[in-house]
Amino acid sequence: MSQHPDINTNVDATSLTDDQKSLDTNATSGNEVAPDGNKHIRIVNTFMKRRTHMNKNAELALTAPEFAHYLVNNSFGDGNLEGIDDLRALFAELPNGSEAPLTLEIGFGLGDSFIEMAAAEPSRNFVGIEVHEPGIGKCAYMAGTQNLSNVRIINGDAIQLLKQLPENHIDRIQLYFPDPWQKKRHHKRRFVSPERMAIVTRSLKQGGWFHTATDWEHYAFWMVEVLDGFVGLSNQAGAGNFTSRPDFRPMTKFERRGLASGHGVWDLIYLKD
């Protein structure tokens, strides 16, 4: 496979620098000089907040006390992650809570598949992080109405959260159908990049999984090239290959419609060596 000209795969988890650990943003594209003459880091987000209608159930879950224990930082203000440095501690009150297998899902959307997975594996703890408040509210509402004890929800930037967590902390990190950022000038916003994967991988336990899926073919091959070239991760389907959708990842309505229209879906599972 020839290397994409925009990809530098010469990064690995062990080479994560102090600068990468301490960045105030999830990526940067250089410095800008402000009117005061000082240099400021330009923020490059991997996500874009959407303004959509919030239904009554989602609004209820964001405000009613019976849902509050699902919402880790709902009272902190928009996306404030201050003090969130141990996801296992969020389940400390549960039997074996801090010792149970831990999954982090990045960008769970409206939360349907996230909640379905949590309900199917009650002995595994699930943390979801999202910036879309209607999705956060809906997810919390579903968790509450199903009385799930193994779910926690965080509002904020996943990369910033991962920087705050200990090394070797998470058993499985999931990233399903991330924004493909199709335009070339936006490729720097793609979540799967060597620099961001260094941050992701340091948080994974030895033997932990990074699992991603996309319905954009170009992004699928971009991801397999980045991840196959990343020291410390092993493609479970073999270099250059994709895996079949595992049984534990539910098929969404959107995915079914796409497949019915002839669109492909590509899954990738990588093990931390």
Swiss-Prot record:
Q: Which residues form the active site?
A: 179
One Pfam short name: Methyltransf_4
Sorted alphabetically, which InterPro entries does this protein's record hold? SAM-dependent_MTases_sf (IPR029063), tRNA_(Gua-N-7)_MeTrfase_Trmb (IPR003358), tRNA_methyltr_TrmB_bact (IPR055361)
Q: Which enzyme type, at the first EC level?
A: transferase
**Pathway given in the UniProt record:** tRNA modification; N(7)-methylguanine-tRNA biosynthesis
Compositionally biased residues, Polar residues: 1-31
Instruction: Please list the residues that bind S-adenosyl-L-methionine.
Output: 105, 130, 157, 179
What EC number(s) does the entry state? 2.1.1.33
Write out the catalysed reaction. guanosine(46) in tRNA + S-adenosyl-L-methionine = N(7)-methylguanosine(46) in tRNA + S-adenosyl-L-homocysteine
Among the GO molecular function terms of this UniProt record, one is:
tRNA (guanine(46)-N7)-methyltransferase activity
Chain's role: Catalyzes the formation of N(7)-methylguanine at position 46 (m7G46) in tRNA.
Q: Which family does it belong to?
A: Belongs to the class I-like SAM-binding methyltransferase superfamily. TrmB family.
This protein is called tRNA (guanine-N(7)-)-methyltransferase
Q: Which gene encodes it?
A: trmB
